[in-house]
Amino acid sequence: MNIKALEPLAGDRNFPDWNTDINISAGENVALDRWQEFQSNGLDSYDENRNFAGIDGTSRLSAHLRWGEIHPRTLLAKLGDSKAHDVFRKEIAWREFYADVLHHNPHTTWDYYAPRFKEMRYDEPDSKFNAWCEGKTGYPFVDAAMRQLVQTGWMHNRTRMVVASFLVKDLHLEWQHGARFFGQHLIDFDVASNSHGWQWTAGCGTDASPYYRVFNPIEQGKRFDAEGDYIRKYVPELTHLSAAEIHEPWLYLDGYSNGYAERVVDHAAERIESLARLSEIKADKPLDPRV
């Protein structure tokens, strides 16, 4: 079975009237200033802070790298031997690795690196996909991330994985739908990093996260936004909830008092469904495309 992903039409989405805050300075001097700031205030703790969505724990250099305002070698030249520096070095290597993979496999821009996953059963985009685009899935950590993307043109790397997993494994949609949406909004959009980052999470890429690894959007929020500050910033409907309440508003009487969206799916049930679909193609890991 060869399933072709359809590009979602912008007219099918009903975005709220959010205020857009895309105001990013550009140029080599800006990139070098940001790199200097990160070296002084974030690099040495990168390994500890890089996954927390609500803090400034990453370099925020992705757009500068994408548009050629700073070279990866400029970053590598300043790195030492500490664990934090080594973790940052590996993240730069991921970017270069994906560029090489796409160079040798150009079809993987929109096609599967592991072709077996074409055979999996997928659903067609519907109102649940629209809810994902709009940040109205009913899962606060997912919704905060999607609203951050639309409002700012950027999304934290941790939440990119979380929302990708939600689209592929909770909504059972092909990864290309999400990859195209990212391409419409990311200021740092890089074809290789985007397509293969999505395929990594979807389980069909190079050295991919196993498909059976399904990110729990509730636990991810509790772990990487424990106090809920990131959620409150982008989901004002939940600002009245405490840290203990904000990740599962459906459990509390006033969780929906400000009009927050109800859950479009039940994560526990969809996780089971996702694994059942995997068993149908009998592929618990991606296959080498040369086979």
Residue ranges and their predicted role:
Residues 1-116, 224-291:
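Glycine/tryptophan-enriched, flexible segments
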Residues 56-237, 243:
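Active-site-proximal binding-pocket segments
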